[in-house]
Regions:
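Catalytic core of non-heme Fe(II) oxygenases with the double-stranded beta-helix
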Residues: 1-113
Length: 113
């Protein structure tokens, strides 16, 4: 089920970000320790404004951790929903122009063994 409410994520380019840094999200997994993150099975991301920014691509790490070319960039259209296993390592690349909005959330199930 959907035990957590979805989140609206905002990433901004450095010229409009109050801290002057590009919005990004470093490599991570959505599943983790604790009662709520351990229940995450499927992660989703819905892109809300793909023509209004540059940079900010959602990337997935494929292959060994030492592989410098092991990430795959995902291109999305307005309103497209991307589903992936919550244990998959992913990131959002730094923004270069504009603001990126996405709705993200997780479907839950029994803990992984």
């Amino acid at each position: 089920g959907l035990a957590e409410p979805p989140n609206v994520m905002r990433y901004q380019a450095p010229d409009i970000n109050p801290n002057g840094k590009p919005g990004k999200y470093d490599w991570h997994m959505d599943v983790g320790p604790g009662p709520v993150p351990s229940m995450r099975k499927i992660s989703y991301s819905i892109l809300l404004n793909p023509t209004e920014y540059e940079g900010g691509e959602l990337c997935f790490h494929i292959g060994r951790n030492t592989d410098p070319h092991g990430d795959q960039h995902m291109e999305s259209m307005l309103g497209s929903m991307l589903l992936f296993p919550s244990y998959m390592v992913h990131r959002v690349l730094p923004m270069t122009k504009g603001t990126r909005y996405a709705i993200v959330g997780w479907a839950h199930g029994s803990s992984f063994s």
